[in-house]
């Protein structure tokens, strides 16, 4: 008997199950008393540890993805593009430092004339125009002008100037940006499904979500241009949302008024008064930053919730229409909402697989056995079709016609993708 057969025979002669079951005593010997874990008590981290670990993992994951995207983008750039990118980063840093230095010099320059300009209507109008025009992207300086308004005119008069110019400026910027960026909006709606989903979420609680967006710490002029690209947002609604959040504008006006008090009474003010004013400025900035960050997180969570709800509604509608074998109708009477929903519906159809698979149709690929590559390619090209379980007047019945006089043998390979 060959060696291979002998080894196989020995393997088959071995028992299929263990010789005996272990006794409880053996279990006690193998496992010490401290090895027995109390269920639901051991190896279960506390909620605070789980939340900390989850938050840390999210930060690490986001940083890893951002680093990967930066490396991927960097590899695609040629030499001169890399030089330009490095130059742009250096220029942005220098501009930021210069803006901070310039802002400090502005208050030093305004200190001698602030008392005179406080009663000047021309100064009020000029500063109002400055706040109005920085609403258009990509201009900057909106927050600085708000602080200057509080520095010159005080907290309440400065807030009135700042709020009215902000509401009118943001509304006009919204209208102009939508007119100029109309082609860009159409391209974004067609290419980016996330853009269509975000635009569609604004139809639920659009005013509430717009107010949350306006409270987020986003660049002011850029935010005006970005929100204008959502076709479901109307200019009056955007202006109303901006007017609702105008109490937020008291923060820069208050900071400006405190800075003026510190600059005017720095020789006469006691250390305690200085500490109170400085602490009030720091506390106001901290509250503004924390509130902006919190609202930003809540805005993202609400947008994801509304997007999931909209996708679920569209998915149910698609499945119902598919089961009833009827074409999809319009999703809304509003053309902008219907456009965004239709784009999102195509994305859902691709996810579900309605575009790639039909229960009544099976793709057949007919391969000729002749062995010729040319004939095989032509057969696949001309004889690939869809099998249907009913016949029309133009289709032939194989049970009536038979195999024919000159029959050929084919292999039928069905390629069916599971749903």
From Swiss-Prot:
What keywords tag this UniProt record? Golgi apparatus, Membrane, Transmembrane, Transmembrane helix
GO biological process terms, alphabetically, are:
mitotic spindle elongation; vesicle-mediated transport
Biased composition of type Basic and acidic residues is found at: 387-411
Give me the Cytoplasmic side stretches, as residue ranges: 104-121, 182-235, 296-419
Any one GO CC term of this protein is: Golgi membrane
**What Pfam families does the record point to?**
VTT_dom (PF09335)
Query: Where in the cell does this protein reside?
Result: Golgi apparatus membrane
Q: How does it sit in the membrane?
A: Multi-pass membrane protein
* Spans annotated as VTT domain: 150-259
Q: Where is this region: Disordered?
A: 1-49, 365-419
Q: Is RNA-binding one of the keywords UniProt gives this record?
A: no
**Record's InterPro entries?**
Golgi_membrane_TVP38/TMEM64, VTT_dom
| Parts of the chain on the Lumenal side | 1-82, 143-158, 257-274
Transmembrane segments annotated in the record for this chain = 83-103, 122-142, 159-181, 236-256, 275-295
Question: Where mainly located?
Answer: Golgi
Its biological purpose: Golgi membrane protein involved in vesicular trafficking and spindle migration.
Q: What's the domain remark here?
A: The VTT domain was previously called the SNARE-assoc domain. As there is no evidence that this domain associates with SNARE proteins, it was renamed as VMP1, TMEM41, and TVP38 (VTT) domain.
Protein family: Belongs to the TVP38/TMEM64 family.
Q: What is this protein called?
A: Golgi apparatus membrane protein tvp38
Q: Which organism is it from?
A: Aspergillus clavatus (strain ATCC 1007 / CBS 513.65 / DSM 816 / NCTC 3887 / NRRL 1 / QM 1276 / 107)
Q: Which gene encodes it?
A: tvp38
């Amino acid at each position: 008997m060959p060696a291979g057969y002998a080894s196989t025979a020995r393997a088959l002669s071995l028992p299929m199950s263990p010789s005996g079951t272990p006794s409880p005593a053996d279990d006690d010997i193998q496992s010490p008393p401290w090895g027995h874990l109390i269920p639901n008590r051991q190896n279960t981290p506390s909620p605070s540890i789980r939340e900390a670990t989850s938050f840390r993992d999210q930060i690490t994951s986001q940083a890893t993805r951002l680093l990967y995207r930066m490396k991927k983008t960097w590899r695609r750039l040629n030499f001169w593009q890399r030089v330009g990118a490095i130059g742009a980063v250096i220029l942005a840093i220098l501009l930021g430092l210069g803006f901070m230095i310039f802002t400090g010099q502005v208050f030093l320059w305004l200190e001698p004339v602030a008392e005179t300009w406080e009663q000047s209507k021309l100064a009020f109008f000029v500063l109002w125009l400055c706040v109005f025009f920085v609403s258009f992207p990509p201009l900057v300086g909106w927050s600085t002008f708000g602080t200057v308004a509080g520095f010159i005119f005080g907290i309440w008069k400065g807030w009135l100037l700042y709020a009215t110019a902000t509401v009118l400026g943001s509304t006009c910027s919204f209208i102009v940006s939508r007119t100029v960026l109309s082609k860009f909006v159409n391209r974004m709606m067609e290419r980016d499904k996330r853009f269509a989903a975000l635009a569609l979420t604004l139809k639920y609680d659009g005013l509430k979500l717009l107010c949350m967006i306006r409270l987020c710490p986003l660049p002011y002029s850029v935010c005006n241009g970005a929100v204008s690209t959502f076709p479901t947002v109307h200019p009056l609604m955007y202006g109303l949302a901006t007017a609702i959040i105008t109490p937020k504008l008291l923060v820069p006006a208050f900071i400006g008024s405190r800075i003026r008090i510190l600059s005017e009474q720095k020789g006469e003010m006691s250390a305690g008064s200085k500490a109170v004013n400085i602490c009030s400025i720091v506390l106001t900035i901290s509250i503004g930053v924390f509130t902006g960050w919190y609202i930003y997180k809540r805005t993202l969570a609400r947008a994801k919730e509304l997007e999931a709800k909209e996708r679920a509604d569209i998915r149910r509608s698609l499945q119902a229409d598919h089961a009833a074998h009827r074409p999809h109708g319009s999703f809304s009477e509003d053309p902008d909402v219907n456009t965004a929903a239709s784009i999102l519906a195509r994305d859902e159809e691709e996810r579900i697989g309605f575009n790639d698979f039909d229960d009544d149709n099976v793709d057949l690929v007919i391969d000729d056995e002749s062995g010729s590559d040319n004939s095989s390619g032509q057969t696949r090209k001309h004889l690939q079709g869809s099998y249907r379980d009913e016949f029309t007047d133009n289709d032939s019945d194989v049970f009536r016609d038979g195999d024919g006089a000159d029959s050929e043998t084919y292999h039928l390979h069905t390629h069916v993708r599971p749903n």
